[in-house]
Amino acid sequence: MKLTREFPSNYAMAQWQPSDHKDAQVIGELFAHFGAERFTIQNTRTGVPVVWLSRELLLDVMGFLRKLPSPFVMLFDLSATDERMRSHRHDLPDSDFTVFYHLISIDRNADLMLKVPLKEGDLTLPTVSRHFPNANWYEREVWDLMGINFDGHPHLTRIMMPKSWQGHPLRKDYPARATEFDPFMLDAVKQDQEQDNLLFKPEEWGMARGNENEDYMFLNLGPNHPSAHGAFRLVLQLDGEEIRDCVPDIGYHHRGAEKMGERQSWHSYIPYTDRVEYLGGVMNNLPYVLAVEKLAGIKVPQRVDMIRVMLAELFRIQSHLLFIGTYIQDVGAMTPVFFTFTDRQRIYTIIEAITGARMHPAWFRIGGVAHDLPVGWQRLVQDNLLSWLPKRLMDYEKAAMRNSILRGRTIGVAAYNTEQALAWGTTGGGLRATGLNFDVRKWRPYSGYDQFEFEVPVGANGDAYDRALVRIEEVRQSMRIIEQCMKNMPEGPFKADHPLTTPPPKERTLQDIETLITHFLQVSWGPVMPAAESFQMIEATKGINSYYLTSDGSTMSYRTRIRTPSFAHLQQIPSVIRGQMVSDLIVYLGSIDFVMSDVDR
């Protein structure tokens, strides 16, 4: 493993502003090859060029982007929007449903969003899974939740909802509250039907039940197996101990987080973000509030940026400590997990003193944070983290990472290269373990990360061992960032002085009746955001997390798209684990570092 210190300044993206990005290099390349008349460029606050095109052109454009000298190698996200109730669609193609494809070019450090308009009577698109294999699950999700078909898809079935589910929940005409449904009744007939739906039928997945000489075993790992790390089911096709193939089965933890975003105000949705990746705490608030602040045009004070960075890195450390302890436990060592949980308690002591809560503080606000740092917070950080954890990390390395059993179980196991990682949408430590230095905090700095001195740990082999090694070193780098926050915390307010800051600064409400009225409206009814689209990605605990928000000029989001890293990481499992042993699968699952709420949302 190596550390990267220097980063080319020309790769750091400028502050994202409302723009149509017509000057982007890729726009010129598309116009030159296909003709400008075949595209519509949308002006957004996403910071990304947004290009509308017809479905007939989609596959040709995808193939073209894949073959450019600096190609777009990752399908970062794929989802859809029900446009039928949207009021503010000025100068956009006529569309009832819109499918969008978010692509990333690593060589350019650039993004591109493609949008395809569809009419309600003809909701069909060609699959792009032959260009991007990770489109498989994303297209299944779009069909499941929006009802859009993808011709040529290898297995277009439900992925979040049960097989027996009626309707497509993310459509605007689908109820958003449980009270709008008839009472649920589980009689004997329905129970038998649901149990039959859960039976795995190999033929449906193109799997043989055996070869000429023997039958294969089909084994359910989960959804309640301790090594599955949550409500996650893997159906394994086994030839003895060898895994010939497997089918991941997700959705058991699905709670409709994106649908909830359509029924909560911009302010009251913040606690819901905490639960998307329940180990990340305020790390989940960050991309959401940054995206909302782009909509509102809010620039937060420097003190707010640094407070947010410090809290985000505290949660990164406690999440990585949980990973280290449970990963070593998966390999067979029991003792380290108790030490890592003890160390996590020290970090929670800091978090609770600052925010008032532990795992789910919901502490970030639109335009700032909930309140200022408490008196004596520096001593808490020093005593419970900076003076304690460095030595403990050395102990973990000696006891675990240099342990011959762990090394034997992990080195060379479940390895993949950078090209494969990008093809499956892998981000975070799982991508950097392959040798690629791609950390959003460095490549696309947000919240003032460009002001901090830290290095990006990078592996070399892309195996289960390197994925653990990278995360241990990331803990050290997070401590460096926190120490800089402690020494350089600027003075100033903890909220922006902006009309859409929610809640508004308290001292203003005590002097100005108009501000008090604004406070009442924004907290009870909710702030009204300008009609626009915004996007923000961050380097979260498990990989890149992002929020893509569509405002229709209301107190609530018209469409809240949450892209989580773990969804992509679990889709990659079959391609990595085929031909390996069941024991290797357990190690691989532990090395991914996922929680099912991050997958299922």
Curated annotation (Swiss-Prot):
Q: What class of enzyme is it?
A: translocase
Keywords attached to this Swiss-Prot or TrEMBL record, sorted alphabetically, are: Cell inner membrane, Cell membrane, Membrane, Multifunctional enzyme, NAD, Quinone, Translocase, Transport, Ubiquinone
Protein location: Cell inner membrane
Named from the GO MF annotations, one term is:
NADH:ubiquinone reductase (non-electrogenic) activity
InterPro entries on file: NADH_DH_suC, NADH_DH_suCD, NADH_Q_OxRdtase_suD, NADH_quin_OxRdtase_su_C/D-like, NADH_UbQ_OxRdtase_30kDa_su, NADH_UbQ_OxRdtase_49kDa_CS, NDH1_su_D/H, NiFe-Hase_large
Using the UniProt annotation, give all residue ranges assigned to the region (NADH dehydrogenase I subunit C).
1-191
What reaction does this enzyme carry out catalytically? a quinone + NADH + 5 H(+)(in) = a quinol + NAD(+) + 4 H(+)(out)
Q: What is its EC number?
A: 7.1.1.-
Q: Which GO terms describe its cellular component?
A: NADH dehydrogenase complex; plasma membrane
Gene3D superfamilies, from UniProt?
Answer: Cytochrome-c3 Hydrogenase, chain B (1.10.645.10), NADH:ubiquinone oxidoreductase, 30kDa subunit (3.30.460.80)
Q: Name one Pfam family in it.
A: Complex1_49kDa
Q: Where is this region: NADH dehydrogenase I subunit D?
A: 215-601
Q: Does the record bear Transport in its keywords?
A: yes
- Give the membrane topology, semicolon-separated if more than one: Peripheral membrane protein
- Show the SUPFAM superfamilies listed in the entry: HydB/Nqo4-like, Nqo5-like
Family in the record: In the N-terminal section; belongs to the complex I 30 kDa subunit family. In the C-terminal section; belongs to the complex I 49 kDa subunit family.
- Tell me how this protein assembles: NDH-1 is composed of 13 different subunits. Subunits NuoB, CD, E, F, and G constitute the peripheral sector of the complex.
Q: What does this protein do?
A: NDH-1 shuttles electrons from NADH, via FMN and iron-sulfur (Fe-S) centers, to quinones in the respiratory chain. The immediate electron acceptor for the enzyme in this species is believed to be ubiquinone. Couples the redox reaction to proton translocation (for every two electrons transferred, four hydrogen ions are translocated across the cytoplasmic membrane), and thus conserves the redox energy in a proton gradient.
Entry protein name: NADH-quinone oxidoreductase subunit C/D
Could you tell me which species this protein originates from? Aeromonas hydrophila subsp. hydrophila (strain ATCC 7966 / DSM 30187 / BCRC 13018 / CCUG 14551 / JCM 1027 / KCTC 2358 / NCIMB 9240 / NCTC 8049)
